[in-house]
């Protein structure tokens, strides 16, 4: 079962945050890294982003993003390779640090956007000189998988 079929804590929290605080993406070009089913990308577009690119290496994930964009009547763009992506105004990444091997992306993101937002429920505080923890929010995976309470707090990080 692909992970992205669920609305995990961080993606849900980031989508809610974008809809509540649309000024972070309004009129900007946004890339949603590890887009999964497109929840964060769709929220960014609904929040007023000029363009939103769903980036995921899984072709079935990108197809899911396409279907969900149609269901939500939003226009998105799609990429299966971060390294073929253009420079964007904002890069969003939710639920991508669950594997410590993915931490190198924190540096890679900076090659594509000066403003990067990371939301993660598994990493409570990572030490990186280019990022700062700025917020913490509660969320529940949907459907509720009865996961440990420790994962229900999502940490938000932003580039300095």
Language-model features: locations:
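S-adenosylmethionine-dependent methyltransferases
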Residues: 1-160
């Amino acid at each position: 079962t692909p992970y992205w079929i669920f609305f995990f804590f961080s993606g849900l929290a980031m989508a809610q945050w974008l809809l509540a605080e649309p000024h972070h993406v309004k009129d900007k070009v946004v890339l949603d890294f590890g887009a999964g089913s497109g929840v964060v990308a769709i929220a960014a577009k609904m929040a007023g982003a000029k363009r939103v690119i769903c980036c995921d290496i899984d072709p079935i994930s990108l197809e899911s993003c396409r279907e969900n964009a149609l269901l939500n009547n939003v226009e998105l763009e799609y990429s299966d390779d971060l390294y073929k992506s253009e420079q964007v105004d904002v890069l969003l990444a939710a639920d991508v640090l669950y594997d410590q091997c993915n931490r190198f992306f924190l540096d890679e993101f900076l090659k594509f956007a000066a403003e990067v937002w990371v939301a993660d429920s598994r990493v409570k505080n990572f030490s990186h000189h280019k990022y700062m923890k700025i917020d913490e929010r509660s969320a529940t995976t949907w459907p509720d998988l009865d996961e440990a309470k420790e994962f229900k707090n999502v940490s938000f990080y932003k580039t300095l």
